[in-house]
Amino acid sequence: MATYLIGDVHGCYDELIALLQQVEFTPDTDTLWLTGDLVARGPGSLDVLRYVKSLGNSVRLVLGNHDLHLLAVFAGISRNKPKDRLTPLLEAPDADELLNWLRRQPLLQVDEKKKLVMAHAGITPQWDLQTAKECARDVEAVLSSDSYPFFLDAMYGDMPNNWSPELSGLARLRFITNAFTRMRYCFPNGQLDMYSKASPENAPAPLKPWFAIPGPVSEAYSIAFGHWASLEGKGTPEGIYALDTGCCWGGELTCLRWEDKQYFVQPSNRQMDMGEGEAVNA
């Protein structure tokens, strides 16, 4: 009865299956946690979604910015970019079923027994856990409703970048989406910076990685996240687990077995290219 946490798959189906075989994942008894960005860049987004959906209650996942971008393409809001390699998925006979399932997935996972929280980009230090839960539910409710295309059309943008309980409407939903799926750096007060993508040692002052700023959630829970492949899984404080190691760029797909904190990796089938093409502003 093991819990396996795996970083951003990005359509790397063959590597995902090989990694699960390596750890002897058994859906009947084990649980798989996925940090989001299941799709795009790799060649197997369709197979990834079909497989993950088939796992039912054996999987716990969160949505990432590329997953949201896929939903926006599906809704006719965003352009299908060839480099994302999404056409086989969008043209599949079960595309409607898969994508309507995908849009009903959460932005946040919490296991109180394990004191473990997972979100694609992390947890902004401006939130306590109750606020994070409420904010996740706000976006999840819209995504699972019939009005989800209206939200997807309005989610693109970098502002507002400072949390306030007084935020409302689309501005509130956009901040929540950015915090859960796009965040990397913050100002010392926790305000989001949506522009810098430099490695932490090269980040302009006064910016800090979100996980370097103490917050209520990181002080009480472990946090697993993906999104930031250029970290290569390194440089985070104790209890903060960066799991995106750039499989779709030629790096590795990384798995953390929670019970003993042992790592497993599956090398990418692609050539190394760690230039993160994060043009998706979802």
UniProtKB/Swiss-Prot annotation:
InterPro entries: ApaH, Calcineurin-like_PHP_ApaH, Metallo-depent_PP-like
Keyword Iron-sulfur: no
Gene3D superfamilies assigned: 3.60.21.10
Pfam family, any one: Metallophos
UniProt entry keywords in alphabetical sequence: Hydrolase
GO molecular function: bis(5'-nucleosyl)-tetraphosphatase (symmetrical) activity
Disulfide cross-links: none
Homology family: Belongs to the Ap4A hydrolase family.
Function description: Hydrolyzes diadenosine 5',5'''-P1,P4-tetraphosphate to yield ADP.
Protein name according to UniProt: Bis(5'-nucleosyl)-tetraphosphatase, symmetrical
Organism of provenance: Salmonella schwarzengrund (strain CVM19633)
Gene: apaH
